[in-house]
């Protein structure tokens, strides 16, 4: 089997630390045939991936991990683009981020005002207008300037204590966005039971297949062997491609969570892409 790790994060994801070239260097050393950068709601590292593929002789499949929702809970879809994602996907990702950030900020400001904190919507809008899509977020920058959140840890603790949750775009819309950008859509880590994200059974996957889902991430560090076998059976029954990857973000002691530690059959994926 020619191995592919089709779920890797670079520093284009806010919670990841690897430079694109670091990923390729490790992938080459570990004998991978192909890899994908699946950064959260970002395709910023794909250009580097396409350039590095020739240097390291490792095939690169441009990708993204889109934050979405299903059944009232967060869910994720992986987009894969044989010819690179079209600019329309960038617009979709930006709109998705902008919408969620504003919804959360409005709810958070209302919460803070209810706690007697002097912060206004007008102040937030001025901060957002200056740098809406940058990191850290406009809400963090505003609360930091006003001395409400001294650092990111304080801000995150404030977020958690508020209990506010805002759902991203519905999963079928994310699937459509992948198709509109010339790619395929794969359900990410369907069995990753964190108590927060949605855990998928065959009925839900079948519903998404009807909505255009192309595949299932069968192989993932969070899946047990039994789950891998069950999701493989579901994928085969529904005619969906089976993908997999390490979901690597930062250096980890668990080998299955590092580059190439979890993988799928590159030729099977390639065959599906070339249909």
Language model features by range: what are they?
Residues 11-12, 37-38, 96-97, 127-128, ...:
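A generic structural signal for short
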Residues 36-37, 245:
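Short beta-strand segments at enzyme active-site cores
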């Amino acid at each position: 089997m020619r191995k592919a790790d089709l779920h890797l994060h670079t520093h284009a994801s806010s919670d990841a630390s690897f430079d694109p070239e670091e990923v390729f260097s490790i992938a080459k050393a570990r004998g991978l045939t192909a890899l994908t950068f699946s950064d959260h709601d970002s395709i910023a590292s794909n250009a580097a991936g396409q350039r590095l593929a020739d240097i390291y002789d490792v095939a690169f499949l441009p990708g993204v991990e889109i934050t979405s929702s299903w059944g009232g809970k967060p869910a994720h879809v992986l987009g894969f683009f044989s010819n690179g994602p079209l600019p329309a996907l960038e617009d979709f990702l930006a709109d998705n981020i902008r919408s969620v950030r504003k919804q959360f900020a409005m709810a958070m400001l209302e919460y803070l005002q209810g706690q007697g904190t002097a912060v206004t919507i007008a102040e937030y809008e001025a901060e957002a207008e200056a740098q809406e899509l940058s990191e850290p977020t406009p809400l963090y920058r505003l609360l930091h300037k006003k001395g409400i959140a001294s650092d990111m840890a304080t801000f995150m603790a404030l977020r958690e204590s508020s209990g506010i949750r805002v759902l991203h775009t519905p999963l079928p819309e994310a699937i459509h966005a992948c198709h509109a950008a010339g790619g395929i859509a794969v359900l990410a880590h369907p069995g990753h039971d964190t108590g927060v994200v949605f855990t998928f059974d065959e009925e839900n996957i079948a519903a998404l297949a009807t909505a255009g889902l192309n595949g299932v991430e069968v192989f993932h560090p969070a899946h047990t062997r039994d789950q891998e076998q069950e999701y493989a059976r579901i994928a085969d029954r529904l005619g969906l491609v089976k993908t997999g990857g390490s979901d690597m973000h930062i250096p980890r002691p668990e080998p299955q969570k590092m580059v190439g530690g979890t993988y799928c059959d590159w030729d099977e994926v390639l065959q599906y892409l070339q249909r």
